[in-house]
Amino acid sequence: MVNASKVSKKRKAVTRDVEEEAGVFSGDELNAENLDGALSDNANELSSDEDDSEVELVDEFSDEDDEDEEELDSDEIPSDGEEPKKKSASTAVDGPQADDESSSEDEQPNFRIEKDANGEDRYIYDEINPDDNSDYSDVDENANTIGNIPLKFYDEYPHIGYDINGKKIMRPAKGEALDALLDSIEIPKGWTGLTDPSTGKPLELSQDELELLRKVQMNEIPEEGYDPYEPLMEWFSNKQEIMPLSAAPEPKRRFVPSKHEAKRVMKIVKAIKEGRILPYKPPTEEDEDKDVINYDLWADEAERPDHPMHVPAPKLPPPGYEESYHPPPEYLPDKKERKAWEETDPEDREQEFLPNDFGSLRKVPGYENFVKEKFERCLDLYLAPRVRRSKLNIDPESLLPKLPSPEELKPFPTTCATVFRGHKGRVRTVSVDPSGVWLATGGDDGTLRVWELLTGRQLWTVKLSDEDAVNVVRWRPGKDAVVLAAGVGDDIFLAVPPIVDPELEKASLELIDAGWGYAASRPPPTAAEENKKNTPPQWIRPSAALADSGVCAVIPLRYVVKTLSWHRRGDYFVTVCPGSSTPASVAISIHTLSKHLTQFPFRKRIKGGGPPQTAHFHPSKPILFVANQRTIRAYDLSRQLLVKIVQPGARWISSFDIHPTSSTAAGGDNIIVGSYDRRLLWHDLELSQRPYKTLRYHRKAIRSVKFHPGGRYPLFADASDDGSLQIFHGSVTGDMLSNASIVPLKVLKGHKITGELGVLDVDWHPREAWCVSAGADGTCRLWM
């Protein structure tokens, strides 16, 4: 009886099924923790009148019983006579509830007795079938019961692990080729095509897992009922609170220094003073053992000098475009070239490979001739003879042409002799008359002024406009008459300044008045012709005030005139209106002084290079040079043909000038071009359409360039926005084997930069090596 009671305390078999309240558990599953939790949860439901079974349940689990339970393991075998005792004990625990149920199946034990390897009894318990009130869940047949063990450990065995009873879990059968084909045709529900690494079986997903994957794939929220756009509750900003969130007073530790920290700091300070705490030093290597002697085999090794006859190997040439893995299309051979290369003998081929396009570097295969090329390279290095070639030590200065000294090229202007002041605002244009006595200027104040060149005294002035500036002023060439042409706004004014002797003044007025009779003989234009934009304008007489001042005729062009240039005979002059809104048919106009006639030679815009900028007549041929923004075109007026196109290569041409001795015995056609991109270009038209020389000496745009007229002095000058003028010596010869000689002579500085503008125009004295400049600072200067 004693043994049986002891066994009943250790292991109890459930003798009935608990339907509603699981108050009794088997001895293997019930422990102190389960008991405390069960009693605490059902404390309110228990009545004060507890039955005997509950008292017996508490008595069975005493301290002594716990000690005995620790001594007996689930795999230990009880002695004979314990089983009846255990059955009676379990019956006593059930109490009167067991008497109410008469089912014989409930009285069966939940274990069976088998013999182990030693011939002793072993208890094998049945699998627990939990109900709704149990902590256990249903056993999943597909669950991994072998633990967290990689299946690769069992690759050499027919099983994949062991279950809780120590039996082998055999490897699941794999589908053959026919099963795989059927699965691919009829995909089973939950099929993924993957294998579960924990069980070795096909991985199947539940409907919830599939729905979760679908939501993740569709970028939806996986969690049900989650609202990512809930209204923001600004707890601390939406309502103004009067009382503070915490009215606790500030602790003293926040504003009183800590005494504890002060003590620790003083200890550290004292240790530093006593030398017990030293500053940090980087760790050094441990001192080597002096007894160990290390020998350096290469201590006395000296570099071996090269052999006296040593010649370094020549370097391989760098690879070209044809050796690239992605060469340009023009390097790729076509079918005809590839066939010809393949049919050619390998020794006669120009190159040992054909270029190929692989698209990317990772697609480039191995080079089949790599070993062969390296072998031939080695053969060349030790079989081919080498020769030393001495390098030519050439002084770079010796390659430059020897230019004459500027002292040998005098005279040329070097100093400022006279300053002309009187204009309000910028002085845009300047011109010296053919006699070299008077100087005409025009500026932003709309006045045209004539000065005495040597003294700087103003002789004559006229107000041509209150709003527009005088953009260009030019004297008529020739000494038989004195006529001054000025472009102001969209009008051209022809004036005879009353500064000459009466006979010359009378001849000048008669020259202009002769055209009025010729103009009167022409039929007047109709109303339809007047409405056309390309209708030539009619010359008109000036107002009485302007006529009294010396203005004789006005030409209304309807567009702003920027440049004006006379023909060498003095009967024609050409004007250019470079505005972007100016029609192409009226941008360039040629005027005849003796007939008071204006003509538009171009009906269409010049192709390429933008709108026209300036134009000049050839000094000895019936050729008109017209420059737009990028090119200069030469037109033969007699044959009405395009003769030549000059390409300076500049971005925006500002001005150009023709050499006065062009097409004579002294030389061919030569022109100089100034551009807004700070370049001065010399063109020899018989040599090339491209520039012969390009000079870049200015820091800002070049506004004007000019040759010395007459060809007496081989000089030319340019004016720039950097406030300086540069004088050059440019000589041309009749020898076709020699080129023009260009020598920089002098940089003239005197104008002030105003509004990012410097020197706007420059002109030469007809007989002397003097030049006159007009600046944005409102002054003109004579340089001698």
From Swiss-Prot:
Keyword tags: Nucleus, Repeat, Ribosome biogenesis, rRNA processing, WD repeat
Entry keyword Cell inner membrane: no
Gene Ontology MF term list: large ribosomal subunit rRNA binding; ribonucleoprotein complex binding
WD repeat intervals: 422-461, 465-505, 607-645, 648-693, 697-738, 754-784
Superkingdom of the source species: Eukaryota
UniProt region (Disordered), positions on chain: 1-138, 303-353
Subcellular location: Nucleus, Nucleolus; Nucleus, Nucleoplasm
Any GO BP annotation: maturation of LSU-rRNA from tricistronic rRNA transcript (SSU-rRNA, 5.8S rRNA, LSU-rRNA)
Function: Component of the NOP7 complex, which is required for maturation of the 25S and 5.8S ribosomal RNAs and formation of the 60S ribosome.
Name of the featured protein: Ribosome biogenesis protein erb1
